[in-house]
Amino acid sequence: MPLVDDHAVAPIAPAFTCGLDATLKVISGKWKPLILYFLLRGPTRYGELKRAIRDVSDKVLIQQLKELEAAGVLRRNDYKEVPPRVDYTLTELGQSLAQALEPLCQWGTDNMAVMQKLFAERDGWGRGRD
């Protein structure tokens, strides 16, 4: 236990304002929802995740995998083989969370063309840049 003024103080569990707050605590991070999405397919090796999630750096991917593991939603499986073989799987908790993201994936699929157009207009694609 941590000490405050030489007295042991019990750690305080985080308080969440609502269920969404608790969910966001787990999935906040640019790549975490994509990691969960790709792990829904089953055991996945690091290299497969790296190829599937474009533009993520090794440092950030490793950090976010560790954070998701600490949150109890994924498991790192080290097979203790030579050459080394490691993969990642969702825990039961992670399965339920990743499945909850599926409606968001469907929304993105249904609205992808509209979103591409809006972002292109916003970012000035297709216009001459001054």
Outline where the language-model segments fall.
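C-terminal regulatory/oligomerization modules of transcriptional regulators
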Residues: 1-17, 70, 75, 92-130
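N-terminal helix-turn-helix DNA-binding core of bacterial DNA-binding proteins
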Residues: 14-60, 66, 80, 87, ...
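Proline-rich low-complexity regions
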Residues: 54, 83-84, 99, 103
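Beta-hairpin "wing" of winged helix-turn-helix
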Residues: 69-89
